[in-house]
Amino acid sequence: MKQTSLSWRMATGVAATVLALYASPVMAGNEAEVAEHLIELVKIGRGVLSEQMKNINDPAKADKGFTGDYMSSQVVERFKKSTKLDLRIPNVVPQANLYLALVQAEKEVVDEAQPIINKPGISFKGFIPAVFARRVGEQFYKKSGVRMKLTGIDYRNANNKPDDFEAEVLRMFNDPRHPKGQSYVRNTMVDGKPVLRMMDPEYAGPTCLGCHGSPKGERDVTGMKKEGWKEGELAGAISVVLPLK
């Protein structure tokens, strides 16, 4: 696996010094773009993990070589490719401290999972993209005060249960009149404080159907009942609650 670079270590060092400063909310004016970038970082990290599923679940191997450093370096590299923002040079990226806090959360989640990732003799570890995203959201909230989660009508984990706002938006996403793939954003109040809420719809792809497809009610590899999804149907959304000034 590719090892993390010196520039990434420097960037994470900068992040460590500014994480405490990110108790301050995001300035109004660019908050929607910030939320979009946070969603992109989660999607990238989840994609990196998805590529590693066969490696992680190989019962014949012990050390898989899939580390937090590998995750963070891949996320930073792919984020630059998709957004033209280079988090290895944080002083030139607006809100770099916030983005780096999320990358650090992704790194930590992979590092914490090393004992199970590298345990031989097990063909399914349970460290799947949905679990990764949930743990990253929990870690990131502790660092930043920004809430991020996967949610959906057919949620499996209670932490992914949609709140009233999310349930309303999910119904809108499921309406055939809503443009497929179009996110939804609203400035509102949560607990008496101004926030930006963004939800980005996600649709069932081929890799989702092994656990969530047909036949409905059949047990999947995790022991849960399949939901009977079909490819292209609404699977859920990534939800962001971003505090504002």
Show the residue positions of the predicted features.
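Compositionally biased, intrinsically disordered low-complexity segments enriched
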Residues: 4-5, 199, 214
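Cleavable N-terminal signal peptides
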Residues: 15-16, 26
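Bacterial N-terminal signal peptides that target proteins for export
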Residues: 2-14
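Extracytoplasmic c-type cytochrome modules immediately beyond a signal peptide or single-pass transmembrane anchor
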Residues: 27-203, 217-245
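The canonical Cys-X-X-Cys-His
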Residues: 204-216
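Intrinsically disordered, low-complexity regions enriched in Ser/Pro/Gly/Gln/His and often acidic
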Residues: 1-2, 222
